[in-house]
């Protein structure tokens, strides 16, 4: 795909200055080191350095033109003869729109659904992809674990890819015949305009609880970032195009603002509260391997069976099914497919049932990505429903991240677990012991607790202490296969460590 520079600039409502060359653009690049002849260089402002500072290097290496910020132009001023465009602020917004236009606005060719919230994004997006594919609609998935579409799969580097490569991926997905797309949209992505140029057919708000306050400063700022998905990126046609969890106070606030532009959903047991929602569940029965009940929607009521564990996963299911019904897919077909959903790696993943032959008397071991106070509480409550004896929890908190949530996670663990093993979880530049001390400040009730900074030993300790009918929840890393220590990233997988610890276990009583 190729376009001319002037055409691209006019498409995003920018004036073309006198004397600016009008080269044909072969591709877009944000890395001056990877420029190929005919590329348009987009100098993005990063966390540590402004990529626009390297515009001259990009031109030397064959870029036909460069687009940079005013700040970058002051450091290395271009002449009027240089093929350089200086963008107004916010630069990231214009670059996202430019990338979308270059790739032919691919999001407008599919039913793209954005999922945002603190917890539940990954499971909800996996559900949407699975259900649409099961109904015969080729689908794409963009998120924390993976980016994939027919005949293509790649490990994700970010929950939401940056705008320029994201638009290229969307075009490839469209070329592969995709009809639906499920995209996790993080608050960072919304703040940094990574989804600029994306037209969302639908959106889901899962919940909002404490996380990323090292970046957003306050819950209000965090909420405003999330809410921008619904205010600025949804297609406008006057009808409902979103599903909002009103059991969450921030969701209730957003739903009130959106009014008839959304469907609300609730799991509240109070029937008067629940039945005010557009989507809700009745006749709920807990089974050993999931739930069954009746799912109520504005388009009808159907029986369902869900293989997902935990009440929070009922909300994920309700929202995934709800947004697809809202977009026109048949409720009965969606629920028929739901029972076959294989789950999500590292999300309430039962290790004993994951290719590991269980001996009589083994404890049940669960690995989950829960890394916020609310997420940990949900995972512990779900795990409690599976235990006939003790609930053991292994967890830590990330270094160089929101310190305020550490004591809150300690408080949650002490409240809901019988035995806690506090350990490391990507300590980065911080001392693991200092992080553990911060966690300990929240453990004020009389709790059985062990401290083991070495995560592999902590997992072994928890499983070694577990008896028959105990449940061990290993929280925080989920699907991740690494541990970040100082400037080093080492291979580490909670699931592998759990299987190893189970294989060494000899005491089953």
Swiss-Prot record:
The keyword ATP-binding applies. Its EC number is 6.3.2.13. SUPFAM superfamilies: MurD-like peptide ligases, catalytic domain (SSF53623), MurD-like peptide ligases, peptide-binding domain (SSF53244), MurE/MurF N-terminal domain (SSF63418). UDP-N-acetyl-alpha-D-muramoyl-L-alanyl-D-glutamate binds at residues 32, 159-160, 186, 192, 194. It catalyses: UDP-N-acetyl-alpha-D-muramoyl-L-alanyl-D-glutamate + meso-2,6-diaminopimelate + ATP = UDP-N-acetyl-alpha-D-muramoyl-L-alanyl-gamma-D-glutamyl-meso-2,6-diaminopimelate + ADP + phosphate + H(+). GO terms for biological process: cell division; cell wall organization; peptidoglycan biosynthetic process; regulation of cell shape. ATP binds at residues 117-123. The modification N6-carboxylysine is found at residue 226. Carboxylation is probably crucial for Mg(2+) binding and, consequently, for the gamma-phosphate positioning of ATP. GO terms for cellular component: cytoplasm. InterPro entries: Mur-like_cat_sf, Mur_ligase_C, Mur_ligase_C_dom_sf, Mur_ligase_cen, Mur_ligase_N, MurE/MurF_N, UDP-N-AcMur-Glu-dNH2Pim_ligase. Keywords: ATP-binding, Cell cycle, Cell division, Cell shape, Cell wall biogenesis/degradation, Cytoplasm, Ligase, Magnesium, Nucleotide-binding, Peptidoglycan synthesis. It comes from the Bacteria. Pathway: Cell wall biogenesis; peptidoglycan biosynthesis. Meso-2,6-diaminopimelate binds at residues 401, 425-428, 476, 480. It is found in: Cytoplasm. A motif (Meso-diaminopimelate recognition motif) lies at residues 425-428. Belongs to the MurCDEF family. MurE subfamily. Catalyzes the addition of meso-diaminopimelic acid to the nucleotide precursor UDP-N-acetylmuramoyl-L-alanyl-D-glutamate (UMAG) in the biosynthesis of bacterial cell-wall peptidoglycan. HAMAP family: MurE. This is UDP-N-acetylmuramoyl-L-alanyl-D-glutamate--2,6-diaminopimelate ligase. It comes from Prochlorococcus marinus (strain NATL2A).
